[in-house]
């Protein structure tokens, strides 16, 4: 994005900010709590951007003054040197501020602030794929714990030799989707399985779907589209095990999506949880369909969010994790321990770079 385009957008933001301040002073707005909250929230969102823009304008004024000093100080070498030093500092500050403002103006995903449900499914590779699905679940659990998110399983189908055929994890916290959305896709592992007696390297896969939580208003469910049945599930222990029908089997007839919930202690809780999962799955389908239509070929390079996209290979022999979208390797052991900051940060940076490129081309046209 060139500087002139950036300034046009920043002037628009400043004008909107000033208009919002006038509205906040309006008695009619003050007497309408809902409208007041909406305007105050939008003003708070724009304020840091406007303050940084005003800083940029101040720096540009200072640069003009320093250039005047330089023109007038040809006969005074000490003053000229001081002015040149000051100009270098201001130019660096200006460059950093322009970069910061450019990032702040990039389109935001409205779902970035949400909590998510992670669905991990064993893919190709039989028992080893199920074990690998369990390893991925532990990786995300460790990452969430480091950040301070709440991470808990809400639905699972265990495998005979360990791991899971399918697992859904609830991850709650601030801006979870903004971090984990880059994890959607096929995760491939190359290693010697614990079940392998000949020491041969096997390749197995697991798929990860990242589903932002959907509220009942956003994704409405028609009761006529649902088929709900119950089953016996392990209770609190002792005499209750397999005697109380607390498990819920939910089928969404139009899509064929089936959700089986057993993790909660009561049938009502499992029913509510199954509804939450179904809404998240339907929202994921809607997002994937929109991305396929609207996401440009350039931005698709850093991921489409589709669960069938091959995004990463974990190679145990070489202690290497390769992200195929970035073409970058990361230490395997660190990644599996949940140290995903560098990897996810690289994905975010690449997406931002591609978005800036795209905005630049749009402004030229």
UniProtKB/Swiss-Prot annotation:
UniProt PTM: Methylated by PrmC. Methylation increases the termination efficiency of RF1.
Protein's cellular compartments: Cytoplasm
GO molecular function ontology, one term from the record: translation release factor activity, codon specific
Modified residues (N5-methylglutamine): 239
Superkingdom of origin: Bacteria
SMART domains given in the database record: PCRF (SM00937)
Keyword terms, alphabetized: Cytoplasm, Methylation, Protein biosynthesis
GO cellular component: cytoplasm
Protein biosynthesis in keyword set: yes
PANTHER family: LD18447P, PEPTIDE CHAIN RELEASE FACTOR APG3, CHLOROPLASTIC
Homology family: Belongs to the prokaryotic/mitochondrial release factor family.
Main function: Peptide chain release factor 1 directs the termination of translation in response to the peptide chain termination codons UAG and UAA.
UniProt name for this protein: Peptide chain release factor 1
Lineage: Bacteria, Bacillati, Cyanobacteriota, Cyanophyceae, Synechococcales
């Amino acid at each position: 994005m060139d500087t002139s385009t950036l300034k046009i957008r920043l002037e628009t933001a400043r004008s909107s900010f000033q208009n919002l301040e006038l509205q906040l002073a309006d008695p009619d707005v003050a007497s309408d709590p809902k409208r007041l909250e909406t305007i105050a929230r939008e003003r708070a969102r724009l304020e840091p951007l406007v303050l940084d823009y005003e800083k940029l304008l101040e720096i540009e004024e200072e640069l003009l003054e320093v250039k005047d000093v330089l023109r007038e100080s040809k006969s005074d070498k000490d003053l000229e040197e001081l002015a040149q030093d000051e100009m270098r500092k201001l130019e660096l500050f200006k460059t950093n501020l322009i970069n910061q403002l450019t990032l702040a103006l990039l389109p935001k995903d409205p779902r970035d602030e949400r909590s998510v449900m992670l669905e991990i499914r064993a893919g190709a590779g039989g028992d080893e794929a199920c074990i690998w699905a369990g390893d991925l679940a532990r990786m995300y659990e460790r990452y969430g714990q480091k950040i301070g998110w709440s991470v808990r399983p809400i639905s699972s189908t265990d495998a005979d030799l360990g791991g899971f055929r399918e697992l859904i994890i609830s991850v709650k916290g601030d801006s979870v989707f903004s971090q984990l959305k880059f994890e959607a896709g096929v995760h491939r592992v190359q290693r010697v399985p614990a079940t392998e007696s000949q020491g041969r390297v096997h390749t197995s896969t697991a798929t990860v779907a990242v589903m932002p939580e959907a509220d009942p208003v956003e994704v409405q469910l028609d009761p006529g589209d649902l088929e709900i049945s119950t089953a016996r599930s392990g209770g609190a222990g002792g005499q209750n095990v397999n005697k109380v029908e607390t498990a819920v089997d939910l089928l969404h007839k139009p899509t064929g999506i089936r959700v089986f919930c057993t993790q909660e202690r009561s049938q009502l809780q499992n029913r509510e949880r199954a509804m939450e999962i179904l809404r998240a799955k339907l929202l994921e389908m809607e997002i994937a369909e929109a991305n396929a239509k609207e996401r440009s070929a350039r931005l698709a390079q850093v991921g489409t969010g589709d669960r069938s996209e091959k995004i990463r290979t974990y190679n145990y022999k070489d202690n290497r994790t390769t992200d195929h979208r970035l073409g970058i390797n990361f230490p395997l052991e660190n990644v599996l321990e949940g140290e995903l900051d560098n990897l996810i940060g690289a994905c975010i940076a690449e997406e931002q770079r591609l978005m800036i490129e795209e905005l630049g081309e749009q402004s030229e046209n």
